[in-house]
């Protein structure tokens, strides 16, 4: 019945248009009964309540609204059956006319307070809404237009209701389409970003593949050229062996360098200072023998055994690596003899890199009576070289020649070095029952310019100066004419290098023969 009323509205519009032409008043619209619900609501209720149509339209779980699940099927099958048309938008606009609202914007669900499941009698409470802008449209018409003034009020209300329902449906559709468009735009942006990232990865992969192909071609060409060369394999193996050897030699050299650094704790003193040097007895004795035998470049004596019965103790080699402007002292400790025979006294000499061409001569012998004078005058000087049996002998003043200061320069040891004063030439370790003679060297010369240390000078109570009467007594004291061992120190300077494997008996026999020959030569020379 609702379509009929809707059609009657159209007829009213037509009558309104043609009324001025016929000059007849239109018939008033039929007013429905107040107790009967609108036919549109009754048909809609029957359609929703039909169980056979639940797949297309049905009640919601709350039973206070209905949902159109399949709008295309709804417009195709149900609308023509109940409402004689198939326009779904017209159905939505008609619902809006009766005050239905859309519950969920994402699906077609409509609700009304009087449209409840199982309560069909409430449909009477639902009435058609009157548009608020119906009277405004009438006021906007010109007052002189008699045709518009003669329009019935029912016609204006029906037109306003249709406009309101259409506006509501279109706005909902527009909002839904906008939301869908935004979702699609976001998805499109995300897909474009993924496409760009994929394109970049593909380009990088293509470049890497091209580089790999190029390197492979270069490698193949190189291998082809190398294989054609006949000596390629032999040269490659040789280079590999040489590199392995260099690595091994480098590691060995590093170990040797570390060992040398660990064995070289010496510290180079400043210029003009005196260095206390205590090398092995064998080294110092050989240096003293070279000085006493007037040899410019004397041959080295071979190292003997380190046993207490050997003639020379120690097996070291002289080390003199100092500058010419430095002065060093050599200290020799006494060698304890094991037999009753007098052994050859050992002495020390100082040699440097800048020795004078002419060396001084110094002869010594075993002293008998002179030992008392030495003990009295040099009570603070510790004996460095001594013998158990001292025999009296003769020693002239002309034979005692003190070495020059320049001859004391140049020896810097690699170990056991201390920067001290001139009095460091005396050893502080005295041996009981032993009397020795310390060759002082140029420290006694009047022209020596040496900085004395007060701390060390306190240890020497009275050191004899150059003009001291001690030296006159020492040089003029009578000694035994026994000259068998008179020049024993100088005799040993002409001995040829020996082999370390000699035993003690061979050493003594060879030394005795050399001493006898040397004594005869020296006696002839003195005559």
Swiss-Prot record:
Recorded GO molecular functions are: DNA-binding transcription factor activity; sequence-specific DNA binding
Region feature (Disordered): 128-158, 241-273, 297-341
Q: Where in the cell does this protein reside?
A: Nucleus
Q: Which UniProt keywords apply?
A: Activator, DNA-binding, Nucleus, Phosphoprotein, Stress response, Transcription, Transcription regulation
Q: Could you tell me which InterPro entries the record lists for this protein?
A: HSF_DNA-bd (IPR000232), WH-like_DNA-bd_sf (IPR036388), WH_DNA-bd_sf (IPR036390)
Q: How is it modified after translation?
A: Exhibits temperature-dependent phosphorylation.
Q: Which GO terms describe its cellular component?
A: nucleus
State the DNA-binding region(s).
39-133
Q: Which domain of life is it from?
A: Eukaryota
Compositionally biased, Low complexity: which spans? 134-152
Biological process (GO) annotations?
cellular response to heat; regulation of transcription by RNA polymerase II
Compositional bias annotation for Polar residues: 317-326
* General function of this protein: DNA-binding protein that specifically binds heat shock promoter elements (HSE) and activates transcription.
Q: Which family does it belong to?
A: Belongs to the HSF family.
Give the quaternary structure: Homotrimer.
In Swiss-Prot or TrEMBL terms, this protein is called Heat shock factor protein HSF8
Encoding gene per record:
HSF8
């Amino acid at each position: 019945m609702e379509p009929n009323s809707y059609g009657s509205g159209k007829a009213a519009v037509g009558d309104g248009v043609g009324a001025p032409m016929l000059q007849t008043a239109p018939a008033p619209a039929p007013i429905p009964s107040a107790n009967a619900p609108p036919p549109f609501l009754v048909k809609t209720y029957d359609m929703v309540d039909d169980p056979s149509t639940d797949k297309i339209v049905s009640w919601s779980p709350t039973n206070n609204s209905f949902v159109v699940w399949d709008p295309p099927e709804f417009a195709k099958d149900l609308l023509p059956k109940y409402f004689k048309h198939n326009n779904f938008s017209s159905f939505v606009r008609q619902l809006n006319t009766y005050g239905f609202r859309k519950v969920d914007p994402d699906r077609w669900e409509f609700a009304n307070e009087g449209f409840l499941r199982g309560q069909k009698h409430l449909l009477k409470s639902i009435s058609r809404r009157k548009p608020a802008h119906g009277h405004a449209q009438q006021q906007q018409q010109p007052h002189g237009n008699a045709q518009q003034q003669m329009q019935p009020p029912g016609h204006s209300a029906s037109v306003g209701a249709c406009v309101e329902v259409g506006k509501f449906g279109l706005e909902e559709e527009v909002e839904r389409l906008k939301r869908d468009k935004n979702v699609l735009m976001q998805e499109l942006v995300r897909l474009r970003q993924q496409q760009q990232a994929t394109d970049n990865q593909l380009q990088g992969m293509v470049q890497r593949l091209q580089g790999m192909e190029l390197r492979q071609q270069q490698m193949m060409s190189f291998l082809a050229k190398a294989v054609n060369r006949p000596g390629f394999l032999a040269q490659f193996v040789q280079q590999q062996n040489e590199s392995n050897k260099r690595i091994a030699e480098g590691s060995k050299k590093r170990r040797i360098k570390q060992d040398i650094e660990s064995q070289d704790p010496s510290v180079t003193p400043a210029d003009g200072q005196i260095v206390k040097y205590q090398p092995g007895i064998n080294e110092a004795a050989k240096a003293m023998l070279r000085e006493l035998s007037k040899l410019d470049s004397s041959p080295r004596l071979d190292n003997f055994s380190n046993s207490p019965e050997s003639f020379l103790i120690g097996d070291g080699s002289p080390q003199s690596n100092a500058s010419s402007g430095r002065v060093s002292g050599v200290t020799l400790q006494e060698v304890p003899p094991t037999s009753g025979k007098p052994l050859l006294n050992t002495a020390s000499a100082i040699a440097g890199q800048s020795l004078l061409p002419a060396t001084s001569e110094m002869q010594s012998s075993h002293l008998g009576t002179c030992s008392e004078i030495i003990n009295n005058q040099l009570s603070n000087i510790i004996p460095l070289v001594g013998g158990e049996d001292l025999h009296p002998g003769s020693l002239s003043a002309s034979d005692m020649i003190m070495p020059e200061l320049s001859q004391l320069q140049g020896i810097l040891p690699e170990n056991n070095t201390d920067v001290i004063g001139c009095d460091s030439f005396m050893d502080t370790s005295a041996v009981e029952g032993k009397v020795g003679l310390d060759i002082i060297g140029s420290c006694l010369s009047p022209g020596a310019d040496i900085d004395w240390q007060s701390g060390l000078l306190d240890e020497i109570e009275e050191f004899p100066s150059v003009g001291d009467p001690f030296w006159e007594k020492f040089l003029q004291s009578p000694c035994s004419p026994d000259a068998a061992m008179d020049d024993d120190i100088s005799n040993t300077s002409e001995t040829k290098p020996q082999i370390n494997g000699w035993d003690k008996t061979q050493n003594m026999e060879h030394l005795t023969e050399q001493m006898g020959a040397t004594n005869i030569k020296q006696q002839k020379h003195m005559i």
